[in-house]
């Protein structure tokens, strides 16, 4: 229904962003909303997919058509919902997911929250040979440089909220928090990416 939405990025939250266009604010769920942080209060184009449920109509948004395409593919797999698909794409690029599927790498797939061995096998069964490896869109690898701050700042707190929203448990987050506190991060996006790297390693 909505191929993409173009407008001003007016708000950022751990689970979603708000894009304002023609006086309407669209709430868009994203894999890692802080990747959009460098575009705050600027015009953006977000590739979207509308998911209709009995109790809600939800917009999901992505930085590239490749990422959107992988979300749509994952969402068709039995046992995979939008939340699990977002968690996978928050931690990996579309190409990394495609390579994992083509190589039948169940160990890689089961590192994501909500993905057990049965679901990993189903992903491979349903998608192997059906997704193409394409050149990665550089926008999926964006970094935002913000002001430096210590780890008692909201940066770490916001990053942990974003990881929790992706489905990671308190136990996993406690392990990640200790490791993140040992480093210095200049943005929430950087801290989220570091946390995801720890969680899927």
Curated annotation (Swiss-Prot):
Location in or out of the cell: Cytoplasm
Primary localization: cytoplasm
Keyword Nucleotide-binding: no
GO terms classed as biological process: DNA recombination; DNA repair
Annotated region described as Domain III, given as residue ranges: 153-201
Cross-referenced CDD domains: UBA_RuvA_C
Highest taxon, organism lineage: Bacteria
Ranges where the record places region Domain II: 64-142
GO MF terms held by the record: ATP binding; four-way junction DNA binding; four-way junction helicase activity
Coiled coil: none
Region described as Domain I: spans on this chain: 1-63
Gene Ontology CC: cytoplasm; Holliday junction helicase complex; Holliday junction resolvase complex
Keywords in alphabetical order: Cytoplasm, DNA damage, DNA recombination, DNA repair, DNA-binding
NCBIfam families in alphabetical order: ruvA (TIGR00084)
Functional summary from the UniProt entry: The RuvA-RuvB-RuvC complex processes Holliday junction (HJ) DNA during genetic recombination and DNA repair, while the RuvA-RuvB complex plays an important role in the rescue of blocked DNA replication forks via replication fork reversal (RFR). RuvA specifically binds to HJ cruciform DNA, conferring on it an open structure. The RuvB hexamer acts as an ATP-dependent pump, pulling dsDNA into and through the RuvAB complex. HJ branch migration allows RuvC to scan DNA until it finds its consensus sequence, where it cleaves and resolves the cruciform DNA.
Domain notes: Has three domains with a flexible linker between the domains II and III and assumes an 'L' shape. Domain III is highly mobile and contacts RuvB.
Family: Belongs to the RuvA family.
Name of the molecule in the record: Holliday junction branch migration complex subunit RuvA
Gene name in the database record: ruvA
């Amino acid at each position: 229904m909505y191929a993409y939405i173009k407008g001003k990025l007016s708000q950022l939250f751990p689970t979603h962003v708000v894009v304002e266009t023609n006086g309407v604010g669209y709430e868009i769920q994203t894999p890692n909303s802080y990747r959009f942080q460098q575009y705050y209060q600027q015009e953006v184009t977000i590739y979207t997919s509308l998911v209709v449920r009995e109790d809600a109509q939800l917009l999901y948004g992505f930085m590239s058509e490749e990422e959107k395409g992988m979300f749509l593919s994952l969402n068709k797999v039995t046992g995979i919902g939008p939340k699990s698909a977002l968690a996978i794409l928050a931690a990996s690029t579309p190409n990394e997911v495609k390579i994992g599927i083509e190589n039948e790498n169940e160990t890689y797939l089961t590192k994501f929250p909500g993905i057990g061995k049965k679901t990993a096998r189903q992903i491979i069964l349903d998608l192997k040979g059906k997704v193409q490896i394409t050149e990665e869109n550089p926008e999926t690898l964006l970094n935002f440089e913000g002001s430096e701050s210590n780890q008692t700042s909201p940066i770490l707190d916001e990053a942990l909220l974003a990881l929790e929203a992706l489905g990671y448990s308190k136990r996993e987050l406690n392990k990640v928090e200790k490791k993140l506190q040992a480093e210095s991060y200049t943005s929430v996006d950087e801290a989220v990416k570091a946390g995801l790297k720890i969680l899927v390693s």
